[in-house]
Amino acid sequence: MSEEKETIKERSSGFISVRDIPGVGSSIADKLEAAGYLSAWSIVVARAEELAERTGLPVLTVQKIIENARKMLGITFKTAREVKQERSNIGKITTGSKSLDELLGGGVETKTITEFFGEYGSGKTQICHQLSVNVQLTPEKGGLNGRAVYIDTEGTFRWERIEAMARALGLDPDKVMDNIYYMRAYNSDHQIAIVDELFTFVPKNDVRLVILDSVTSHFRAEYPGREHLAERQQKLNSHLHQLMRLAEAYNVAVVVTNQVMARPDVFYGDPTTAVGGHVLAHTPGVRIQLRKSKGNKRIARVVDAPHLPEGEVVFVITEEGIRDSEEE
């Protein structure tokens, strides 16, 4: 590997300030940071129009800054082997179930959006609670030594579950809860604003996991009927891409939950489908469907993931958290 490529790798794996971007002086850096753009990677994944609007800088200036940031970080054509090497920087969070981890290719990945969708009681929120605890574990135990952000749109977050899951892992419940930043989102605009704020909050607080439970509930309630469908989908699409940029810019795992709705045109097989249509179907890197089974058993199935084979596993929800089923 050349000296230039070694430098690129070092830069891409760590935090590089916007002040390190060539051509960015202190006054411009102040404006970028005030708007929530702290790292060079946050500039790379930003849209020029949005960056100009939020900073008050001219579009031409912003375009040059983005171009310089991309050159500095080596954002150019890469060989497949180089892409493979870069994936070694991706972290994975255990779900608490070995079989579910294997289905996910080793756990919930950073730098991507993982969606869990299913009917009420299928285990979506339970998995979110477990991940917010497990991300705090050491890498040897399946964590990332990081903190979690939990955005709750339906009021389903329960600190009692966090305590129980922490104790089951031999962790101090109070310390675990101190490392989970909770925010209740009251409508879709509030939800979008919270995610925008995370571009400043995440790098300052060692956050490695962002949970949004659920991503579609407010959009679905506020934009009912076909007459509002186009507006809803456009707004949801922009929101999902903001989450994707967040995951890629700061190497964090983004987990969203989603509801299901009935499909009246389906007479055989599963008559439900995830809410959000094609917009949500094409954005998350990994889509997992959850279904109820007997008792505390749940079934997880890979619906879409470019790097994972199709398959399904059984796991259980216990008082201690997400665990393997005896059947597996």
From Swiss-Prot:
Family (UniProt): Belongs to the eukaryotic RecA-like protein family.
Binding residues annotated for ATP, in chain numbering: G118, E119, Y120, G121, S122, G123, K124, T125
Pfam families associated with the record: Rad51
Keyword DNA damage found: yes
Designated name of the protein: DNA repair and recombination protein RadA
CDD domains: archRadA
InterPro entries (alphabetical): AAA+_ATPase, DNA_recomb/repair_Rad51_C, DNA_recomb/repair_RadA, DNA_recomb/repair_RecA-like, DNA_repair_Rad51/TF_NusA_a-hlx, P-loop_NTPase, RecA_ATP-bd, RecA_monomer-monomer_interface
PANTHER family noted in UniProt: MEIOTIC RECOMBINATION PROTEIN DMC1_LIM15 HOMOLOG, RECA/RAD51/RADA DNA STRAND-PAIRING FAMILY MEMBER
Single GO MF annotation: ATP binding
Species of origin: Desulfurococcus amylolyticus
UniProt keyword list: ATP-binding, DNA damage, DNA recombination, DNA-binding, Nucleotide-binding
An individual GO BP term: DNA recombination
Function noted in UniProt: Involved in DNA repair and in homologous recombination. Binds and assemble on single-stranded DNA to form a nucleoprotein filament. Hydrolyzes ATP in a ssDNA-dependent manner and promotes DNA strand exchange between homologous DNA molecules.
